[in-house]
C-alpha cells in the first residue's frame, strides 16, 4: 500500500519500537520539520519505495541499527548536521538502492556510530555544503561517516562532495575493501577557522586502509 505523510511540527513517522518496510509499500514523506522517520529501535528495509524529504535526518535510529536488503530509498535533507541515514549502532547493506542528497553544512549521506558493512546494492550520496565550526572543532560533510570500521565486499558506491573540506568516506576506524565498486569525487576547497583547518579528502581512515580487490576510483 501507499502512505503519504507531512510532519508539520516534528518527525513525520515515529516509533518506539522497530520499523520494517516490505516489498509493495510506497512511503512518501513530503516534508518534516525534524526527522522523516525516527525510531528508538532498528529500521529494516526489505523492499518497497521510500521517498523522504526532511529538515532533519531522513531516517534516524536513536538506539538501534539499520539493515537494508532490498527496495529503493531516496533521501533528501536540508538542515545543518542532517543525515540521510543516521544509526547509533551498525548499518548493514546487502541489497537495494539508496540515493542520499544532503544540503546542510556538516551533513552526511550515511552517519554510523557503529560499524558499516556493504556487501551489495547501490549507494549514491551527494553533499554540497561546507564544514561547520562547533565545540572548538570543524565538522565536514561526508558521503559516508563511520565511527567504527567499514567493510565493503560488494555493491556499487558513488559519492560526490562539492563543499569546502568535504569528505567522500570518513572513517574513525579501519576500512577494508574486498570487492565492489567505489567511486569518489571531492572538489571542495580547504576550510580554515582560526588555528583549525580541514581539506577535502576522497577516502580518510584513522585506522588501516586495506584494498584487497574490487575497483576504487578517487578524484580529490
Give the location of each predicted region.
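A composition-driven surface/loop motif
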Residues: 1-220
Amino acid at each position: 500500500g501507499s502512505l503519504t505523510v507531512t510532519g508539520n511540527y516534528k518527525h513525520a513517522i515515529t516509533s518506539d519500537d522497530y520499523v520494517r518496510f516490505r516489498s509493495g509499500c510506497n512511503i512518501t514523506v513530503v516534508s518534516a520539520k525534524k526527522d522523516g522517520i525516527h525510531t528508538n529501535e532498528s529500521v529494516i528495509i526489505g523492499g518497497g519505495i521510500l521517498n523522504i524529504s526532511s529538515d532533519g535526518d531522513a531516517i534516524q535510529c536513536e538506539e538501534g541499527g539499520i539493515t537494508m536488503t532490498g527496495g529503493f530509498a531516496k533521501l533528501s535533507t536540508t538542515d545543518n548536521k542532517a543525515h540521510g541515514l543516521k544509526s547509533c549502532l551498525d548499518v548493514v547493506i546487502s541489497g537495494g538502492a539508496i540515493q542520499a542528497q544532503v544540503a546542510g553544512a556538516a551533513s552526511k549521506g550515511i552517519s554510523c556510530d557503529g560499524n558499516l558493512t556493504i556487501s551489495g546494492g547501490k549507494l549514491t550520496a551527494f553533499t554540497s555544503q561546507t564544514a561547520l565550526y562547533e565545540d572548538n572543532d570543524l565538522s565536514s560533510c561526508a558521503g559516508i561517516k563511520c565511527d567504527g570500521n567499514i567493510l565493503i565486499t560488494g555493491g556499487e558506491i558513488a559519492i560526490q562532495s562539492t563543499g569546502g573540506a568535504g569528505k567522500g568516506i570518513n572513517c574513525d576506524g579501519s576500512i577494508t575493501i574486498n570487492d565492489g565498486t567505489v567511486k569518489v569525487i571531492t572538489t571542495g576547497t580547504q576550510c580554515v577557522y582560526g588555528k583549525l583547518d580541514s581539506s577535502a579528502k576522497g577516502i580518510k581512515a584513522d585506522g588501516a586502509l586495506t584494498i584487497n580487490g574490487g575497483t576504487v576510483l578517487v578524484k580529490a
